[in-house]
A protein has these predicted regions:
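Peripheral (often C-terminal) accessory segments that flank ATP-dependent C-N-forming ligase machineries
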Residues: 137, 305-402
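Phosphate-binding site of ATP-dependent enzymes
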Residues: 169-223, 267, 271-279
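Conserved metal-phosphate-binding beta-hairpin within the catalytic cores
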Residues: 251-292, 322-335
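ATP-binding N-terminal substructure of ATP-dependent carboxylate-amine bond-forming enzymes
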Residues: 1-101, 389
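Glycine-rich phosphate-binding loop of ATP-grasp-fold ATP-dependent ligases
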Residues: 146-173, 194-197, 217-238, 373
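ATP-dependent carboxylate/phosphate-activation module, predominantly the ATP-grasp catalytic core
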Residues: 200-255, 284-316
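A conserved helix-loop-beta module that forms one wall/lid of the active-site cleft
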Residues: 92-160, 164-165
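Conserved ATP-binding module of the ATP-grasp superfamily
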Residues: 124-126, 160-193, 228-232, 251-258
C-alpha cells in the first residue's frame, strides 16, 4: 500500500512508523522544520518544492495532491490538518481516506460550533462572558481575571488571561491579526478543576475511547505568548472514579459527532471540578502536534480498524496503561539519550532530529535555550528511568506538589 500523509508537525509520526516498518507499504509525508528523523525510518518526505505546494490555495493543493496520487499510485490518503479537510470532499471516493470531513473539521476550527454541539447533547461548557470583534475598541478590556480569550469561528489557539498585564499584551499584539473583523469570545475560567484529555477514534459512524489522562501545568503555557508546553507540565492517569465520569460525559459528545462522518483520531480537553462536574473545553480532530502516541497495533490492523472493524483499536488498547513522561534539558545543544530507548525497548519520541549521527530535540521543542520532549509507552521500566537520571543530565518533570 502506498500512503500519502499530510499532517501538522509530526502528529501521525507513530502511525507512520508502523507503515514504514513493513515492506508492504511505502510512506510519503509532508514535513515541518527538518526531515532527518523521518528519513531515518524510511518515511519519504516530500521535496522542499512539493512541501511548499501544500501551502498554496485550495484549488492548487487539490491539483497537486491529485497529480501526486496518480503519479505514485497512492492507495491511502491520510490528512490530519483540519484546514485541509476539503481534501476529504474531493478524494473520499477515489482512495482510502483517513481524516475528518469538512463538517467535522469545524469542531476544531470553529470553537463556537464545538460549544454548540456540547450544549445540544447536554454536556456542560464554561459560560461566555463577552463577545465581539478583534477590531472593537473594548477588546480585552474591563475583564475579571482569570479568563480565557478564544477565536469564535477561525482556527487559532485559546489564550489564558491571568492578570491585567496579559490582557494589555493581547491588545498590544492585535496588529498581528490578519483579519481584525474576526469574532472572539471571552470564556469563564474554571478555577476549581483538573484538566482532562480524552483520546478517541471515529470510524464508519462508530467511536472508541482509547485512553484518558490528567495534564497539569499546560494551561500556564497557553498564555498570550505561547510557550513550549513540555516545560513545566506533568501527565498522569485519571483516578478511576474521575475516569468513569469523564468517559460518561465524553460518550454523549462522541455519539453525536460520530454521526458526522470521517475516519480519524482525535482528542478533546475538558475540566473536571471538585463537585464531580465535567466541562467540555476544546476539540482536536487529529492526534496531538509533536505528541503522537504509539498505536500498539500493526499498520494492517490500523487500516482494518479505520475501514472494516473499529474494534481493532479497542483490542489494541485493552489493558494498556499508557505512561507519558515529559523530559527536559536546560541546554538544547545537548544530545538526547536515544540509545536507551533501544536498550530498554521504549517507544521513541516524535520531535527529534538527527545531526551528524546524533539525536537532538527539534526546534519545535526548544525555548529560551532549553528543550523538552515526551516519552509515551506502556510498561516503561524503572531501569530506563534510572539510567537516564543517573547517567545523563536530562531530567523528568515532577508532579507539582506531588
Amino acid at each position: 500500500m502506498n500512503i500519502l500523509n499530510i499532517q501538522l508537525p509530526k502528529n501521525h509520526f507513530h502511525a507512520l512508523l508502523q507503515f514504514s516498518k513493513s515492506n508492504e507499504h511505502k510512506v510519503y509525508s509532508n514535513w515541518h522544520g527538518s526531515t532527518s528523523y523521518e528519513n531515518a525510518y524510511n518515511i519519504h518526505t516530500l521535496s522542499a518544492v512539493n512541501n511548499d505546494k501544500l501551502k498554496l490555495k485550495k484549488d492548487k493543493v487539490i491539483s497537486y495532491v491529485e497529480d501526486f496520487i496518480n503519479e505514485n499510485n497512492i492507495d491511502l490518503l491520510q490528512v490530519s490538518d483540519p484546514t485541509k479537510a476539503y481534501l476529504h470532499t474531493h478524494f473520499k471516493d477515489k482512495v482510502k481516506y483517513i481524516g475528518p470531513t469538512e463538517d467535522v473539521s469545524r469542531l476544531e476550527t470553529d470553537k463556537i460550533f464545538a460549544k454548540e454541539i456540547a450544549n445540544k447533547v447536554g454536556v456542560k461548557t464554561p459560560a461566555i462572558i463577552k463577545t465581539g470583534k478583534y477590531s472593537d475598541s473594548d477588546y480585552c478590556k474591563n475583564l475579571t481575571f482569570p479568563a480565557i480569550e478564544k477565536p469564535s469561528h477561525h482556527w487559532a489557539p485559546a489564550i489564558n488571561l491571568f492578570k491585567e498585564a496579559d490582557a494589555e499584551k493581547a491588545i498590544e499584539l492585535l496588529y498581528l491579526k490578519d483579519n481584525p473583523d474576526d469574532e472572539y469570545f471571552i470564556e469563564e475560567y474554571i478555577n476549581d478543576m483538573i484538566e482532562t484529555n480524552v483520546f478517541f477514534v471515529v470510524a464508519n459512524g462508530e467511536y472508541r475511547i482509547t485512553h484518558t489522562q490528567e495534564i497539569i501545568g499546560e494551561n500556564l503555557n497557553k498564555t498570550v505568548e505561547q510557550k513550549v508546553w513540555y516545560i513545566g507540565s506533568y501527565i498522569k492517569p485519571l483516578k478511576p472514579e474521575v475516569d468513569t465520569i469523564v468517559r460518561k460525559e465524553a460518550d454523549k459528545y462522541l455519539k453525536e459527532i460520530s454521526k458526522m462522518g470521517g475516519n480519524y483520531e482525535g482528542s478533546f480537553c475538558g475540566a473536571y471540578t471538585s463537585t464531580g462536574e465535567w466541562y467540555f473545553l476544546e476539540m482536536n480532530v487529529r492526534p496531538d502536534i509533536l505528541n503522537s502516541t504509539p498505536t500498539f497495533m500493526s499498520a494492517n490492523e490500523y487500516v482494518k480498524g479505520m475501514f472494516e472493524d473499529i474494534s481493532y483499536f479497542e483490542k489494541a488498547w485493552k489493558d494498556i496503561n499508557i505512561q507519558k513522561l515529559l523530559i527536559t534539558h536546560n541546554d538544547s545543544t545537548v544530545e538526547y539519550p536515544f540509545h536507551l530507548h533501544d536498550k530498554y525497548s521504549v517507544a521513541i519520541p516524535n520531535n527529534l532530529e538527527i545531526k551528524n549521527g546524533k539525536y537532538y530535540v527539534s526546534d519545535y521543542g526548544t525555548v529560551d535555550g532549553g528543550c523538552g520532549t515526551i516519552i509515551a509507552d506502556h510498561n516503561i521500566s524503572k531501569e530506563f528511568i534510572k539510567e537516564i537520571e543517573e547517567t545523563t543530565t536530562w531530567t523528568f518533570n515532577k508532579e507539582p506538589n506531588g
